[in-house]
Swiss-Prot record:
This is Internal scaffolding protein B. One of its GO terms (molecular function) is peptidase activity. The proteolytic cleavage of the internal scaffolding protein B releases the scaffold protein in order to continue virion assembly. Residues 31-52 have a biased composition (Polar residues). It is found in: Host cytoplasm. Participates in the assembly of the viral procapsid in the cytoplasm. Forms first a 12S pre-assembly complex with protein H, and F and G pentamers, then twelve 12S complexes are joined by the D protein to form the procapsid. Internal scaffold protein B is released from the procapsid upon genome packaging. Autoproteolytic activity cleaves protein B and probably facilitates its removal through the pores of the procapsid. Coiled coil: none annotated. Component of the procapsid complex composed of 60 copies of the internally located B, 240 copies of the external scaffolding protein D, 60 copies of each of the viral structural proteins F and G proteins, and 12 copies of H. Residues 53-65 have a biased composition (Basic and acidic residues). Its EC number is 3.4.-.-. InterPro entries: Phage_B, Phage_B_sf. Belongs to the microviridae B protein family. It comes from Enterobacteria phage phiK (Bacteriophage phi-K). Phi KhT, a host-range mutant of phi K, can grow on E.coli C and B, besides K12, and is more thermosensitive than the parental phage phi K.
Length: 117
């Protein structure tokens, strides 16, 4: 499935309909028509890590920073440690799981609005 030089997506869809391929780019019928320069078949699985370690650590640090800011907005003070930031996450209106009452203030606007207490 090759895209044309000018980037026409309709040609890509047409060629994809003519040659069905698996998610890793191998032909579905398993024919060894295409071989790489090393001679290995193209239908072998290719390992691709979704995130590198540095990206994963950067995302975790960004997430903790957002939680720390939400903690400070919610409780009006800075958290004592990272443990508090991780355990006392921000209130999510779309989260349908049971929310523990001790994590939130009773006079909070979210709780009054949604009638949890």
């Amino acid at each position: 499935m090759q895209e044309s030089i000018n980037g026409n997506l309709s040609e890509e869809r047409i060629s994809g309909a003519q040659q069905p391929e698996a998610w890793n780019g191998a032909p579905v019928n398993g024919s060894p028509e295409q071989q790489s320069a090393s001679g290995a078949e193209s239908n072998q699985l290719r390992f691709q890590s979704s995130l590198s370690d540095s990206e994963r650590e950067r995302q975790k640090a960004t997430d903790l920073e957002h939680r720390r800011a939400a903690f400070a907005r919610h409780f009006g003070c800075a958290p004592g440690s990272e443990k508090h930031v991780e355990s006392y996450s921000s209130f999510d209106e779309k989260d349908t799981r049971v929310q523990l009452a001790e994590f939130y203030r009773f006079n909070d606007g979210h709780l009054k609005k949604w009638g949890y207490f």
